[in-house]
Amino acid sequence: MNNNQDYLVQMFEKQKEFQKLLTGLDLPKKDYTQLNYTITALIAELGEVLQADKNWKNWKRTKDIHIDREALLDEVVDVYHFIINMTLYLGFDAKDVINKFFEKNKINFERQNNNY
């Protein structure tokens, strides 16, 4: 495992610790109510990413719109928290995600190279 993969493993571990602090429970657990709440929160956070980036509305584009990159990054990181929670609720860990990412990435490149 390289350093970047180690970081993802650490992110998953930190999120597990945080969820235990919030709920008193270890993840993963098969709680589809919590999974649904997590997916709803993820969708809301994605909306907050859009609101933090004022340039997404091409019909309202004006010159020199300032984007608060720190606020935008905060929202993106919140999205990661909920994606990690969702992944944990589904019973996967960081290594599962890493392995599947590279497997799927290879397939995606093959598809594009073969006019998919």
Label every PLM stretch briefly.
Residues 1-116:
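Flexible "arm" and connector segments at domain edges
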